[in-house]
Amino acid sequence: MKSETDKEQLILKAAEEEFLEKGYNGAKTTSIAQKAGVTHAMLHYYYRTKEKLFELVFRNKVRLIADSLKYILDENNNFEDAIANFIHVHFEFLKKNPRLVNFVYNEVYSNKENLDILHRSIFPIIQEVLNKLNSLIETEVKKETIKPVNPLQLILNILSVNIMTFIFYPIMIQYSENKSSAYYKQMLKEREESNIQFILNSIRK
């Protein structure tokens, strides 16, 4: 017999799948209950409303993004290794959570309250990363190994090239003659290496 906690987790997992696939407006609590193997009444008993269930899922996903950025810069590495590791860790996070970017973007765009949640969760961590990155950049500029660069612009460039990969690659694969998972994995590996070199070449002196 499933415990209360098991039932709650099953509902939450089913809700994540439903919201990630269909967004808030397209998701149905009846579908979530069916996926979780519980009654519709039980779903509302544990989570009350669709809004409360969505808010929990959204906060969890935003927290996941925030946590992925916390230790992304290792100041003990040399500069290029630190940047390459930043790109790699972020790329791997997106690879493991391919639907997350579109989900967060769509829900933030459609609801200002979600933007506030995102801002409160992400901004302090982004600021910490920027401070670390600025220190690394200043050191490298003094050593004349890189060009002066705004740390925020560098972060935006990194996030952009990685995120665009996971927005467009699934579409491009549909038009490729080779649609195997092995081919897709190889393409992603090559793209990650390309992103690293693109960013490093853009700041090298």
Where does each model-flagged region fall?
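C-terminal peripheral helix-coil segments that are non-catalytic and often amphipathic
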Residues: 92, 127, 131-143, 147, ...
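Short secondary-structure transition hinges
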Residues: 91-132, 153, 180-186
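All-alpha amphipathic helical-bundle segments outside canonical DNA-binding/catalytic cores
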Residues: 81, 120-121, 125, 138-157
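Hydrophobic/aromatic residues within well-ordered alpha-helical segments
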Residues: 50, 57, 61, 65, ...
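Generic hydrophobic, amphipathic alpha-helix propensity
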Residues: 7-16, 32, 57-61, 65, ...
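Helix-turn-helix
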Residues: 10, 18-52, 56-57
